[in-house]
């Protein structure tokens, strides 16, 4: 038999044996990221027609995040002046900022403080994040926030470092200012 679990956050279930036996298919943010063609198709559903160059710019700026692509296209179609170019998308205002605010609202105040203060870092290294934020347990906090799918990803490399999605970081920096 087969079981499918779809969840926004990674469930705390014992997947080790299934993973070891190659009986587990995990689909994450990287696999769900839209490419330029998929971006074009999604934008067209809002009535916003993109050429190839615009679709590539929007896919790159949103890192393929479907919700951001849709919201940017919707904003462009409904309020042409708010987004002049497909790649001119930010987390500072409009539909994307509204979405990010609603996603951050249920987060603990310390976590919001941590995210906002550490948004000044291009790459978030846990010890540096603790120094910048003034809050302890950065590594555990980053793991927990990443598991909650808050647009935080681990950067591959010899040291454990993290990176915030461009639009999330843009939003947090705007809030910090």
Regions found by a protein language model. Name each.
Residues 90:
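Active-site diphosphate/adenylate-binding microenvironment
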Residues 8, 53-55, 97-174:
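C-terminal boundary/linker of central alpha/beta nucleotide-binding cores
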Residues 18, 83, 94, 107-108:
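Generic signal for short, ordered secondary-structure residues
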Residues 12-16, 86-87, 138-140:
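Intrinsically disordered, low-complexity boundary segments flanking structured domains
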Residues 42-44, 56-61, 67-79, 85-86, ...:
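C-terminal helical "lid" of AAA+/P-loop NTPase domains
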Residues 1, 24, 49, 68, ...:
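A general structural signal for well-ordered secondary-structure junctions
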Residues 1-75, 94-101, 167-174:
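Alpha-helical sensor/transducer elements of the RecA-like P-loop NTPase core
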């Amino acid at each position: 038999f087969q079981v499918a679990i779809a969840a926004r956050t990674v469930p705390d279930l014992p997947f080790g044996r299934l993973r070891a036996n190659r009986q587990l298919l995990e689909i994450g943010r990287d696999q769900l990221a839209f490419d330029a063609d998929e971006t074009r198709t999604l934008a067209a559903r809002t009535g916003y027609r993109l050429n190839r160059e615009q679709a590539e710019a929007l896919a790159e700026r949103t890192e393929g995040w479907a919700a951001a692509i849709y919201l940017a296209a919707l904003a462009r179609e409904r309020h042409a002046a708010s987004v002049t170019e497909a790649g001119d998308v930010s987390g500072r205002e409009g539909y994307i900022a509204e979405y990010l605010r609603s996603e951050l609202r249920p987060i603990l105040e310390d976590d919001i403080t941590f995210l906002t203060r550490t948004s000044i870092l291009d790459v978030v290294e846990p010890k540096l994040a603790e120094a910048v934020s003034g809050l302890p347990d950065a590594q555990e906090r980053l793991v927990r926030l990443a598991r909650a799918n808050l647009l935080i990803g681990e950067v591959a490399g010899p040291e454990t470092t993290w990176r915030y999605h461009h639009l999330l970081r843009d939003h947090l920096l705007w809030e910090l200012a």
